[in-house]
Regions:
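Residue in the alpha/beta-hydrolase core beta-strand immediately N-terminal to the catalytic nucleophile
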Residues: 73, 109, 132-135
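Conserved acidic catalytic loop of the alpha/beta-hydrolase fold
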Residues: 90-108
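Conserved HGGG/HGGXW glycine-rich cap/lid loop of the alpha/beta-hydrolase fold
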Residues: 26, 30-79
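Flexible "cap/lid" loop of the alpha/beta hydrolase fold
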Residues: 125, 132-173
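Catalytic active-site module of serine/aspartate enzymes centered on a nucleophile-bearing elbow/loop
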Residues: 262-296
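Gly/Ala-rich beta-loop-alpha elbow adjacent to hydrolase catalytic centers
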Residues: 112, 116, 120
Length: 296
């Protein structure tokens, strides 16, 4: 085991007693893996680029005490199908609506981290009738500044390096980009992601999705300006924005004008966190989400 990696907070210890189950659904012909737990109003939670459902290991249990928590592996991620598509926000959103249909759910709360937040915003814009309340966690429809593009390019480089060396150390370096303190990252999370990435064809899929995400952040992609800031004004559902004080790629001062366009939004800055506040500061994030969503 490498030094600096904590063994605390194992996935199973976090899940014990919460009734978390792994289910595979047919979502519009795409085999889709979901971790779910709890009863009550549905809460769809979306991970970021290159992620998987275990991203929310510290949130599923606590939130499942109040909601039916649904955490899928996104299209092209984890153990969900990896079709030959462009991986636009439309592709992701359409797949998730198909998943909700397969589960017999018409309307839910939606929360997303990083590109998951962008997808959640896009779902709300496309079909506001299917979203109750929206939570954006370090993900928003807006472009990074020049410094942010450099930081995202660094993440892309770390991702591309997996093609030649998908070792534990390479996976660890990519995960460490996400957190403020690398000691926050557990060895178990590194090993989970290492196993996922070592599926045949998985690294190529992650690189393809990473290219799509960066292309959307840089400008037009597949003929659409998905990250146009003004689209945030089209969000008609109550919105909670959770940002961190050390978010790479899109710091708060850069994206605040986009937040200001949301008609009904409240904002909280999570201290001592980078791109994974739900993992770095789970008690704070779980509490804020619970309070906000229970108002709906």
């Amino acid at each position: 085991m490498s030094s600096g990696i904590s063994e605390s907070g194992s996935v199973w210890l976090e899940f014990m007693g919460s009734g978390v189950k792994e289910t595979f659904y047919d979502a519009g012909g795409r085999r889709t893996r979901v971790l779910e737990a709890g009863a009550g109003q549905p809460l769809l939670i979306l991970h970021g680029t290159g992620g998987h459902a275990e991203t929310y290991q510290r949130n599923i249990g606590p939130l499942s005490q109040h909601f039916h928590v649904i955490v899928p592996d996104l299209l092209g991620h984890g153990f969900t199908d990896r079709p030959e598509v462009d991986y636009t926000l439309d592709d992701f959103a359409d797949h998730l609506f198909a998943l909700l249909d397969a589960m017999g759910i018409h309307r839910s709360h939606v929360s997303g981290e990083s590109i998951g937040g962008c997808i959640a915003a896009w779902m709300t814009i496309k079909h506001p009738d299917r979203v109750d309340r929206l939570v954006l966690n370090t993900g928003i429809l807006d472009r990074p500044d020049e410094k942010g593009l450099v930081q995202l390019a660094d993440l892309e480089k770390r991702t591309q390096s997996l093609r030649d060396d998908c070792s534990l150390d390479t996976v660890r370096r990519r995960l460490e980009w996400l957190v403020l303190d690398r000691d926050t990252m557990t060895e178990e999370m590194v090993r989970i992601r290492h196993r996922i990435y070592n599926q045949p064809g998985m690294v190529d899929s992650v690189i393809r999705v990473m290219h799509a995400v960066l292309s959307m952040n840089r400008g037009l992609y597949c003929g659409h300006d998905y990250m146009a800031r003004e689209r945030m004004a089209e969000i008609s559902r109550p919105t909670l924005v959770l940002w961190s004080d050390h978010n790479p790629g899109k710091p708060f001062d850069v994206i605040k004008p986009a937040i200001d366009l949301i008609p009904d939004a409240e904002v909280h800055i999570i201290k001592d966190a980078a791109h994974w506040p739900q993992f770095e500061q789970p008690d704070m994030v779980n509490g804020l989400m619970r309070q906000f969503l229970l108002r709906g």
